[in-house]
Amino acid sequence: MAPDPWFSTYDSTCQIAQEIAEKIQQRNQYERKGEKAPKLTVTIRALLQNLKEKIALLKDLLLRAVSTHQITQLEGDRRQNLLDDLVTRERLLLASFKNEGAEPDLIRSSLMSEEAKRGAPNPWLFEEPEETRGLGFDEIRQQQQKIIQEQDAGLDALSSIISRQKQMGQEIGNELDEQNEIIDDLANLVENTDEKLRNETRRVNMVDRKSASCGMIMVILLLLVAIVVVAVWPTN
C-alpha cells in the first residue's frame, strides 16, 4: 500500500521541528560562552522557513483530502489537531529563536520522538473513538484505507445494481415496443378485414338489386307472352 503523502509530510515536518530545537539549543550554548554562531543562525532561519512551507503544504493536502472525501470527517479532525500542534510548535520555536519565549530545552522536551509519535495517543484529541485508541499512525492509515476500500466496494455494488436495473428497464421498454408493434399489426388487420366486409356487403346488395330486377323482367316477359297468346287465340 502506498504511504499517505500527508503523514509522510507530517513526519518530515516533525523532524524539522526537532532539528530546529536542537540547533537553537546549540546556538544558545555558544552565546552563553560569549561566542557567535552565524552559520547556525543562518541554518536555523532556513529550517524555520522550510518548516513554514511544510506546514502550509500540510494544510493544502488536508483541505484537498477532506474536500474530495478521501478521508472521513473524523480523520480530518484528527489531522487538523496534529496540524494545530505543529503550528503551536512553530510559534514556540520562532519565539525561542528570537529569545522571546520558552527555553529550547523545554521546547525540545515537548517535541514527540518518532517512537512516541507513532505509539502514544495524541493528547490534543478529545473523545477518541475506541476503534483507534492506542493505535499508531500506520495502523490508523491502514484502518482508514480499509474503510475507504469497503466504501468503494459498496459503491461498486450499488453501481452494479443500478446498471442491472437500467438494463431491465431497457429490456422492458423493448418488450413494450414489440407489444405495441403487435397491437398495431392487429389494428391494421382488423381495419383491412372491416374494409373487406364492407366491400362484400356492397357486392351482396348489388346482387340483390340485380336479382330483383331480373324477377321483374321475367314477370313482364310472361305478361307480354300471355297478351300475345290471348290476342292470337282464335275465337268462335
Swiss-Prot record:
Residue spans making up a coiled coil are: 42-65
Q: Which residues carry this modification: Phosphoserine?
A: S160
Pull the Cytoplasmic topological domain ranges from the record.
1-215
Q: Which stretches are transmembrane?
A: 216-232
Tissue specificity field: Highly expressed in heart. Also found in brain, kidney, liver, lung, placenta, skeletal muscle, spleen and pancreas.
- Example of a GO MF term: chloride channel inhibitor activity
- Residues forming the t-SNARE coiled-coil homology domain are 145-207
Q: Which gene encodes it?
A: STX8
What post-translational changes are documented for it? Ubiquitinated by HECTD3.
Its annotated compartments are: Membrane
Q: Which GO terms describe its biological process?
A: cellular response to type II interferon; early endosome to late endosome transport; intracellular protein transport; regulation of protein localization to plasma membrane; vesicle docking; vesicle fusion
The protein in question is named Syntaxin-8
Q: Which organism is it from?
A: Homo sapiens (Human)
Provide an example Pfam family for this protein. Answer: SNARE
